[in-house]
Every structure is written in structure tokens, then in C-alpha cells.
Amino acid sequence: MFKNSKKKITLGISVQKFESKPNNWKTLIYQRHTITIEELVNLICEGHCICQNFKTASKTFGLREKTIANFDFADCIVLDIDDTFLSMNDFYLSLKDEHKPTIIYTTYSNIDNINNRFRLIYVFNEPIRSNEYYRGIANTIVYNIQKEIEGFDLKDKTCLNSSQQFAGNGNDNIVYYYNDNIDVLIFSRYIMAVVYLPNVIN
């Protein structure tokens, strides 16, 4: 990781904001924004949802356009951690510094030490331009977590694809964030070694 407080990333931000997890994801409308990490944290805390960047004809887009086939690029990778045996704080402290996420925040359904649910965002220093590469880096992140947290399993495998969307948390959330950007080479150099592991890919 390296410090860069002026680093900006581009991603889809929902026009709507929510006080609880959206009931109907099909109604969400997104617009592409280029923002700082701190601005992203503020939008998450306001209850906005986020997604990656897609090739669209208009400034706003929805579920129809948000597909793997339309994927344009990603400046970050987002992973859902559901029903893990560690609280968000303990999970974070268990990771080596080079594998810690840029942003980590609890989801709407999190109940500490009962139903631990949170989200990891890894901001990279260069864009990811294919779903295959996105999955490769995401799987490598999971692989490194599994090496450092014995018994960890990524239960929601849908977040390994670039087409996934993620809720913010505008209600009693806990957020850690750092103005650190991760060198994509830290993870990409291991892709060929782990991308075919059956216990990681689903």
C-alpha cells in the first residue's frame, strides 16, 4: 500500500439512498462518479449503494446495463463477508498489513459476535479492465485471507464478479478507512497460482 490522500476513484453511485437494505434492487438507478476515498466513505454512510463502471449510453443506468458483458473497468474490488466467526474489528486485525482493505464497513444486517456481516473495499492504483482479471484478483484476496484466518470461507460467491452491486449503510454502521491505495501487482502476481483452486472459485 502507499499513501495518496488525493487519489480519486470512479464507480457507480446510486441516485437513491437507503436507511435499510434495499427491498427491490431492480429499482436502483446509478450514476458514474469520480470521487476521493473519503467522499466514498461519506456516501456509504449516507446509505448510497455502489457498483462498478459499465459501458452505457446515458449518464444514469440500472440493472439492465449492469452486466458482465457491459463491464467497463473497476478501480476497486468489493467483497461481502457474511456470517463469519470474527467481528469486523477482529477480522481486520487478523490480516497482514499488505492484505488489509482500504475501506471496511458493517452492513445493515450486522450483529456483532452473533451475525457478523461486513464489506471489504480494496482500492487499486490502476484500473481492472476485464471480469476475468477482476475475478482473479478477488479470488487471490480470498486466498490470502484464508491463509491468515483459519476456517474462513467466502459464503457469498456472487461478489467475485464485477457485475455485483452493494448496499451502503446509513444506519448505525461502523467504518474504518485509510487513504491507502493498493498496488494491483501485490495480488495479480499470484493469480495464476490460485485462480484455479476449487475451494476458492465457485
What spans do the regions from the language model cover?
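Long, charged low-complexity interaction segments
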Residues: 103-106, 191-202
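Short secondary-structure transition/capping segments
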Residues: 148-162, 196-202
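Short, conserved secondary-structure transition motifs
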Residues: 111-113, 123-128, 153-181
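Helical (often loop-to-helix) elements that flank the catalytic cores of nucleotide-handling enzymes
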Residues: 89-97, 123-150, 176-196
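Poly-acidic low-complexity segments
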Residues: 60-62, 67-70, 77, 153-156, ...
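Signature for HUH/AEP ssDNA processing cores
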Residues: 1-118, 123-136
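Feature targets compositionally biased, intrinsically disordered low-complexity regions
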Residues: 11, 46, 61, 150, ...
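Hydrophobic transmembrane signal anchors and adjacent membrane-proximal interface regions, especially
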Residues: 11-15, 27-30, 35, 175-176, ...
